[in-house]
A protein has these predicted regions:
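N-terminal secretory targeting modules
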Residues: 2-3, 7-9, 13-192, 367-374
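Glycine- and acidic-residue-enriched helix-capping/strand-helix junction motifs
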Residues: 107-112, 203-211, 303-307
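Catalytic nucleophile-elbow at a beta strand-turn-alpha helix junction centered on a G-D-S/GDSL motif
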Residues: 190-214
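Oxyanion-hole/transition-state-stabilizing segment in secreted/luminal serine hydrolases
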Residues: 205, 217, 234-279, 290-297, ...
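Short helix-loop-beta junction
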Residues: 214-227, 318
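Substrate-gating cap/lid alpha-helix
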Residues: 293-331
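Histidine-centered active-site loop/cap adjacent to the catalytic His
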Residues: 345-374
Length: 374
């Protein structure tokens, strides 16, 4: 009899335990259930960072007419969405994104997928842009949560697109009751800063799109940008100068030297600058020296190569200033990455630390150039 009662009691305890487990599991599912989202195509919001509207694909960086006029390698890179961003206003407590990439290669050997093909979200807080969240892709088509748990108040947000991949489509997901609207207008007289250069300008090898130096600078100065960085292909071709001259920027920043040998700098740079000056006689132009590579202190041959190119660029700058070009500015390269050799991932391409250091050196010069152009 005693054994029978003990058995019944054990069964009752097991049933109770299973019921409790079931109730807890259901409650957990209810608590953790994702809210239904409303998806907004970002084309309905404010797209910044595009220099031309007549592009072959919406998120391309060069106009459709450039295909066939420029080298194929440059055209292919122009399909990367570097520098393009979406600005919007929302009271959402969580923000998600779903996006489709154009290239299946979502990462590089020296650069993470989060920078190559990911999204990067900032929010304006107390008048400054602050990082809010990022989304790392797993495949060509992705759906990821950028941020959650925010208080419900209206905020201005800025979402950067991938640096080294193209975008087929992009949507922002917010809770059904939330708003997602056009942001406050930029000042009517604001013009973008146009950056032309190499993989470094394009953003290699930032951990996420917002850490490329053009993005850092334009957040700090609260201005718009057009990123025309082309990895391994910034060699100051006249066709590229013609395209750049079609734009109407506040400032041109030219940073192509890492892709050019000294003879190319000597023969091509003066003509490139002159093509811009012919169309924009007073627009400030900033010339940027090659950075000092990480192993330069113990590698004389490498140091000699970029030192020669820098000296030629300096001479071009001085000759133009002497001839009366008062809106030409210059950034030396020896301090751009710091002095400890810790600013790159592979001796050449900056890490996030390197990009922050570059922005620190460039910011005061860009400020002066922007003032000069007003």
């Amino acid at each position: 009899m005693k054994t029978y009662k003990q058995t019944i009691k054990r069964i009752q305890l097991l049933v109770t335990a299973n019921l409790l487990f079931f109730v807890c599991a259901v409650n957990a599912q209810i608590v953790n259930a994702e809210p239904q989202l409303r998806w907004v195509d970002v084309k309905e919001l404010c797209i910044e960072g595009k220099g031309w509207t007549d592009t072959k694909h919406f998120y391309d960086r060069f106009p459709a007419k450039a295909e066939g006029l420029i080298r194929k390698s440059v055209w292919d890179l122009s399909e990367n969405s570097a520098g393009i961003c979406v600005r919007f206003k929302t009271d959402a407590t969580s923000i998600s994104a779903r996006w489709t990439l154009r290239n299946r290669k979502i990462a590089l050997t020296n650069m993470a997928a989060s920078g190559v093909s990911g999204l990067d979200l900032y929010v304006r807080f107390n008048g400054e842009w602050r990082w809010l969240g990022a989304a790392r892709p797993d495949s060509v088509t992705n759906e990821k949560k950028l941020t959650a748990g925010m208080s419900q108040e209206v905020r201005e947000c800025l979402l950067y697109l991938p640096l080294y991949n193209g975008i087929e489509n992009l949507e922002i997901g917010i809770p059904l009751e939330a708003k997602c609207e056009l942001p406050p207008l930029r000042p009517i007289n604001m013009k973008p800063v146009v950056f032309y250069g190499t993989s470094i300008v394009q953003g290699g090898c930032a951990s996420r799109p917002g850490m490329a130096y053009p993005a850092i600078l334009c957040r700090r100065l609260d201005c718009t940008m057009i990123n025309l960085g082309f990895s391994g292909n910034a060699i100051c071709e006249p066709e590229i100068a013609t395209l750049l001259a079609e734009l109407d920027p506040a400032v041109y920043m030219l940073d192509p030297l890492p892709n050019m040998n000294s003879e190319m700098v000597k023969s091509r740079m003066p003509e490139f600058i002159e093509k811009l000056r012919t169309v924009h006689p007073k627009t400030p132009i900033i010339l940027v020296e090659n950075t000092e590579m990480g192993d330069a202190p113990v590698n004389p041959s490498r140091r000699e190569g970029y030192s020669t190119s820098n000296a030629i660029l300096r001479k071009i700058f001085e000759e133009r200033v002497k001839a009366g070009d008062r809106n030409l500015f210059y950034i030396r390269g020896d301090k751009l990455l710091g002095t400890d050799g810790q600013g790159t991932v592979d001796r050449v391409h900056p890490s996030d630390l390197g990009f922050m250091r570059m922005a620190d050196v460039m910011e005061p010069v860009l400020k002066r150039a922007l003032r000069a152009g007003r």
